[in-house]
């Protein structure tokens, strides 16, 4: 009886601490803006593999390397907390992240995950792909997936922003993953917006990364239950 009471009280205390920590969590929201002349849309040339062309029924596929949205913001920018979490430990997320080779392109083009979080790699195409990850801080991997529906699971052992993933069979295929030791990151959507939730109160340096335009950093102080706005602006080349 005493043991059951002790277990109940321990569970109750942990629940209260968990609820309090999350109820006091802060949020960073914002946009990644684009300034300058909007670059022309670049189409991918898939002539090296007739199966890829057939998948798209002859239609051209736009590159996701630089996507300027209708409101002059950038899609596919990786935004994350770069500094301010030193000394804090966060449990590794157990849910799988996924990257799919579909239509001879990677889905998603940019994403984030935690170090040692499982990454499921899927080939949804009826053609040969190989996925070649090129981290500098973790062990690279390069494996073939010759059959439709094949799945493999890999991890990155160490944080790194960004890790390039490519296909040696199809030169136009590329994706980028931000690997972190914490879960505080986001990727801009088709409105250029991002949201980073669940932050402890503190002073942070937030970085926005873009495949073409590089990086920018901003400093922000987030209070308990606070929501702060941080906007970035990249200028076209």
PLM regions and their residue ranges:
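Bacterial N-terminal signal peptides
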Residues: 9-19
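Bacterial N-terminal signal peptides that target proteins for export
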Residues: 1-10
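Extracytoplasmic copper-binding redox domains, predominantly the cupredoxin/blue-copper superfamily
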Residues: 22-237
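Intrinsically disordered, low-complexity peptide-like regions
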Residues: 2, 20-22
């Amino acid at each position: 009886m005493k043991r059951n009471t002790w277990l109940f009280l321990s569970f109750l205390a942990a629940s209260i601490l968990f609820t309090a920590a999350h109820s006091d969590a802060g949020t960073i929201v914002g946009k990644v803006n684009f300034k300058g002349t909007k670059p022309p849309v670049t189409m991918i040339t898939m002539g090296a593999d007739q199966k890829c062309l057939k998948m798209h029924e002859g239609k051209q596929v736009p590159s996701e390397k630089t996507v300027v949205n209708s409101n002059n913001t950038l899609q596919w920018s990786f935004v994350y907390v770069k500094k301010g979490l030193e000394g804090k430990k966060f449990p590794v997320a157990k849910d799988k992240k996924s990257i799919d080779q579909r239509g001879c392109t990677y889905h998603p083009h940019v994403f984030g995950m935690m170090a040692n979080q499982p990454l499921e790699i899927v080939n949804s195409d009826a053609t040969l792909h190989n996925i070649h990850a090129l981290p500098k801080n973790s062990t690279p991997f390069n494996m073939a997936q010759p059959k439709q529906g094949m799945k493999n699971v890999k991890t990155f052992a160490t944080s790194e922003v960004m890790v390039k993933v490519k296909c040696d069979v199809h030169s136009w295929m590329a994706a980028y993953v931000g690997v972190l030791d914490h879960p505080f990151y986001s990727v801009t959507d088709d409105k250029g917006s991002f949201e980073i939730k669940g932050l402890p109160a503190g002073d942070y340096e937030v970085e926005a990364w873009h495949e073409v335009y590089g990086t920018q950093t901003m400093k922000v102080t987030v209070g308990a239950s606070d929501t702060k706005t941080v906007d970035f602006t990249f200028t076209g080349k």
